[in-house]
């Protein structure tokens, strides 16, 4: 629809049609034949009787005799009239264009009071001044705030083009003087004001139609979103149905007892360029120290442990790498292998306890933390041995925390590892404030510990402090750019504050670090399921079904580089 077209019919013909259809207008002085409406107005308007004048006064002073419903008027909020071109209203402006009923009623009362507060002559003079200002402009495509005073049309009618109306208004009216009749100039100006008001009313109706179309489009988006969400839910349901009874029993044991009843064996990558390399372990250590991709270092350590299954340090390094690489269960499997060879390995005990907390095996984690403290400070932990086999979660947590506090108070200086263990215990009990205090104390001793910065970020995120968490994750990534888990956690916090595109970029960056040059992608072994599922959620939040359908194990990340920076 063009800027100067509305309903496609002559304005005065519409006025005539409305008068014929509305019984409230078919009274003395408002009978109007269907032929030559413009000429009728020009030649017979001078014959205004007292009854006609009373009806006109009712129009101009907004007498209660004519309600908005009778005249078919729609209130026009002034906020809309001051928002620029009529076709310039955008979806994101819906907050100003879609006013509530209460707001509309308030505007209606204020306009009514403004009209009623003036005498008929004062109201006419004000309207004439407004019309004169408007007539000086060359375009009707934009609205001005000043128009809000007469923004409510006096009748529900139509206007087809400015050309027809301007042609009629340029004719010299032939009126004879009569008692109580408006002067020639005043009548033309008033009629012009009414015609302008009619045009405004039609413009607002067009805007309403556009709003309806936008609502239909938004409903379509909502339907697409619901369809995608239902599909994801269905996939989850299918996966749950495929779960065996034994797996259900394992999950039950996990959530009801907090103990790890069965740890799956380590899943090795089938394509490993470091296999049969006698220096695989050393290569892995060099890759870690130089900030190479964790997935590449993992391949080197995998080759080392397959070459020598009793290599304790290789199992330890492999477990450390995989937990940082957002492959928790593989990391736990490697660390368990390390502990089976060296039950008092302190780094393995601390790392695996944190992994068990992440996976929900709290009792097993508390047991590991207790073992770590006994192995590190045996002289300070001579309290009675905890019966871990016959104790509930609450009491085990309480006793282990008490031991850690005793050791922390007995030490002459802060031990960051004791603070880490104590903070992990508080974290498991969702006492995140205490956790944050412990981790910050540890960072005061070692501010360049990227792992501790990541753990601090996780604690802040769980305390609903996403912005601070993001800062902590960025600090961890500044110290170690290949830290995949920190990128994953950063994506979670970004989603929590509505930054879905930034979250997707962090996740895609994390997935890209799972790729190793000259090694084909082999699906779930290489790419973390957690990252893939979170990436799907970010695309759903972005309402990007086209991208969602591309997310799958082994996908080519190059297809996302044109739109995302990673």
Swiss-Prot record:
Motif (WxxxF/Y motif 3): 248-252
GO MF annotation terms: peroxisome matrix targeting signal-1 binding
Motif WxxxF/Y motif 2: positions: 187-191
Location of region: Amphipathic helix 3 (AH3): 145-151
Sequence position, cross-link Glycyl cysteine thioester (Cys-Gly) (interchain with G-Cter in ubiquitin): 5
PTM field: Monoubiquitinated at Cys-5 by PEX2 during PEX5 passage through the retrotranslocation channel: monoubiquitination acts as a signal for PEX5 extraction and is required for proper export from peroxisomes and recycling. When PEX5 recycling is compromised, polyubiquitinated at Lys-17 by PEX10 during its passage through the retrotranslocation channel, leading to its degradation.
Biased composition (Polar residues): 94-142
Family statement: Belongs to the peroxisomal targeting signal receptor family.
This protein's domain notes: The TPR repeats mediate interaction with proteins containing a C-terminal PTS1-type tripeptide peroxisomal targeting signal (SKL-type). The WxxxF/Y motifs mediate interaction with PEX14, promoting association with the PEX13-PEX14 docking complex.
Assembly: Interacts (via WxxxF/Y and LVxEF motifs) with PEX14; promoting translocation through the PEX13-PEX14 docking complex.
Role description: Receptor that mediates peroxisomal import of proteins containing a C-terminal PTS1-type tripeptide peroxisomal targeting signal (SKL-type). Binds to cargo proteins containing a PTS1 peroxisomal targeting signal in the cytosol, and translocates them into the peroxisome matrix by passing through the PEX13-PEX14 docking complex along with cargo proteins. PEX5 receptor is then retrotranslocated into the cytosol, leading to release of bound cargo in the peroxisome matrix, and reset for a subsequent peroxisome import cycle.
Protein name per its UniProtKB record: Peroxisomal targeting signal receptor
